[in-house]
């Protein structure tokens, strides 16, 4: 399994902000660490998120909901979720509207982590 480092994610965030606008900066490093580590945690030999689809969705969900960055939390959450899945051989097919609806509804608290997992599985090719 391929994972992105914290440094890579910070670099990607800075590039997203540069390209799409907003304020660069980390609001809370602890919340970022929590979002990045949660998908890979477990207890004893039991992985909390055993599938790559679950790990990718948890990564996106944590980045969106933890609000670790000053700006661009939804953008980085969506981007990192898709990048992680792609790096691990999982390609998705979706419209921009479908992705936007997912991310905005997660950010608004209308969809939960489980909904993101279902979305990923539904759109997997």
Where are these regions (language model features)?
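FIC/Doc superfamily catalytic core
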Residues: 1-125
């Amino acid at each position: 399994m391929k994972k992105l480092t914290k440094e890579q994610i910070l670099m990607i965030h800075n590039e997203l902000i540069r390209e799409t606008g907003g304020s660069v900066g980390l609001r809370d490093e602890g919340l970022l660490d929590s979002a990045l580590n949660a998908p890979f945690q477990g207890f004893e030999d039991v992985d909390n998120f055993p599938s790559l689809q679950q790990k990718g969705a948890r990564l996106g969900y944590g980045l969106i909901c933890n609000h670790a960055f000053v700006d661009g939390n939804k953008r980085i959450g969506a981007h990192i979720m898709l990048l992680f899945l792609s790096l691990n051989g999982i390609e998705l097919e979706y419209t921009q509207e479908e992705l936007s609806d997912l991310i905005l509804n997660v950010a608004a608290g209308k969809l939960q982590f489980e909904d993101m997992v279902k979305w990923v599985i539904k759109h997997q090719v």
